[in-house]
């Protein structure tokens, strides 16, 4: 049986995403993938809904609508989760559900009928308008006011995705790529419409109007796995330890401490060594590829292993893979005419993995700023709530105020690239690209 929620990370809808892409390319009524990088993703709204229709038709028949979690939460807080009345956020609809003013909203029912007639019913039930996250969705209902210990009737802002909120919490501005790094990673960028001269950026995840800052276009591209890659490797190395626990040879506490020590130990050992251009090379596609040009069926690969490859060197190859994936995205963006002049990193990884961050700076060949922000998404949500509640006239004013209050201009650590590593990194990056082409076309 299906649960109440569908996780974005689940790629069960890969076939449906590919079908949406093919149907959209053949549809004569308009190019509805124009603002989604030219490809639809298995992580997004319509692919998951189409997959649900085909795998659980009974539930699909009973369902009134599919609601993004960030929209459902605001409805819950306001005391009304009726799908027709929930404020649908520009962020969710614009980045994941094909909503755009150029289309007059969502694609028409005729488009969805080419995929499955049941989708047209869900399309009919969606409101025509979406709301930017600097606006009020409603007011806090008595039930949740009591649960949260807050006054009933205070403003509840329209929701948005965590990475977009984190980018605002990090003080995003034009020319800056905010890299939100955790289990996965997202590159968040804002540009003025005139910067693109009416063009859509191909090969990224999506671009949406005003999903972070009203009046600016928000671009999103990222990696489906980042921290998850290192967690996977840690799990491989921890397997014998878990066997010792089952045989009573090690305690729970000792096991937990030992597992927690694996990544720091690997990082320390790898940081003491100079990289070699004959070492192993890995891909970061452990959970498919988001960008450039999404493909959630591809898998990671590794080449160049030898009997002299030890755990720290293998770990370094995985760290390079994650960094190379970021570089490929940034190079693609620049090739599309998008300025990336500065990189700011927030999330769990920047705060606890200096070796990973230094490698990222070396690979990107730019300084990577890591401000001291422990809860960037919460900070961004608070910023928008302050605008929705009338404390600031607009998002950009709130951004400037929050940046000054938090000292974002000076706080945190900057990772500068080591120039000595450039020749080896360039060789390894070309091998990364070659391995990627081989896996892509295999």
Predicted regions and their residues:
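Gly/Ser/Thr-rich active-site cleft segment
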Residues: 27-158, 283-287, 315, 319
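Short beta-strand scaffold segments in enzyme catalytic cores
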Residues: 75, 96-97, 165-169, 185-189, ...
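Beta-sheet entry/capping signal
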Residues: 63-66, 153-155, 175-178, 186, ...
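Glycine/Thr-rich phosphate-binding loops that ligate phosphate moieties of nucleotide
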Residues: 1-18, 58, 80-82, 105, ...
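Conserved phosphate-binding catalytic cores of ATP/NTP-utilizing and phosphoryl-transfer enzymes
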Residues: 141-150, 160-176
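Hydrophobic side chains within alpha-helical segments
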Residues: 13, 51, 74, 165-167, ...
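Active-site phosphate-binding/coordination module
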Residues: 1-44
């Amino acid at each position: 049986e299906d649960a109440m929620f569908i996780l974005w990370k689940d790629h069960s809808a890969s076939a449906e995403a590919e079908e949406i892409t093919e149907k959209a390319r053949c549809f004569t009524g308009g190019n509805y993938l124009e603002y989604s990088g030219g490809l639809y993703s298995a992580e997004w709204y319509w692919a998951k809904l189409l997959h649900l229709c085909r795998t659980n038709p009974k539930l699909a028949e009973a369902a009134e609508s599919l609601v993004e979690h960030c929209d459902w939460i605001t409805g819950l807080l306001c005391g009304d989760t009726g799908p027709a009345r929930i404020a649908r956020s520009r962020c969710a609809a614009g980045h994941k559900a094909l909503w755009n003013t150029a289309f007059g909203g969502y694609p028409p029912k005729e488009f969805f009928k080419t995929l499955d007639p049941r989708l047209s019913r869900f399309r009919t039930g969606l409101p025509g308008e979406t709301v930017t996250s600097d606006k009020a969705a409603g007011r806090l209902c008595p039930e949740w006011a009591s649960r949260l210990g807050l006054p009933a009737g205070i403003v509840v802002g329209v929701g948005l995705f965590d990475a977009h909120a984190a980018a605002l919490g990090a003080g995003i501005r034009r020319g800056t790529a905010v890299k939100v790094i955790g289990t996965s990673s997202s590159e968040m960028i804002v540009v003025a419409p005139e910067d693109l001269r009416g063009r859509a950026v191909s090969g990224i995840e999506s671009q949406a109007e005003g999903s972070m800052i009203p009046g600016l276009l928000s671009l999103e591209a990222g990696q489906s796995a980042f921290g998850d890659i290192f967690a996977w490797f840690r799990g491989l190395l921890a397997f014998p330890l878990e066997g010792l626990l089952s045989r009573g040879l090690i305690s729970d506490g000792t096991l937990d401490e030992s597992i927690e020590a694996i990544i720091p130990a690997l990082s320390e050992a790898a940081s003491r060594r100079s990289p070699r251009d004959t070492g192993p090379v890995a891909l970061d596609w452990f959970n498919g590829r988001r960008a450039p040009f999404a493909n959630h069926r591809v898998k990671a690969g590794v080449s160049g292993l030898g009997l002299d490859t030890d755990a720290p060197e293998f770990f370094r190859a995985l760290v390079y893979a994650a960094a190379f994936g970021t570089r490929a995205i940034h190079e693609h963006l620049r090739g599309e005419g998008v300025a990336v002049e500065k990189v700011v990193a927030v999330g769990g990884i920047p705060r606890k993995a200096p070796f990973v961050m230094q490698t990222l700076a070396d690979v990107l060949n730019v300084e990577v700023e890591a401000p001291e922000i422990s809860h960037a998404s919460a900070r961004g949500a608070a910023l928008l709530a302050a605008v929705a509640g009338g404390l600031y006239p607009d998002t950009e004013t709130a951004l400037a105020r929050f940046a000054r209050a938090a000292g974002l201009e000076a706080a945190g650590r900057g990772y500068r690239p080591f120039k000595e590593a450039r020749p080896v990194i360039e060789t390894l990056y070309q091998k990364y690209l070659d391995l990627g082409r081989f896996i892509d076309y295999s």
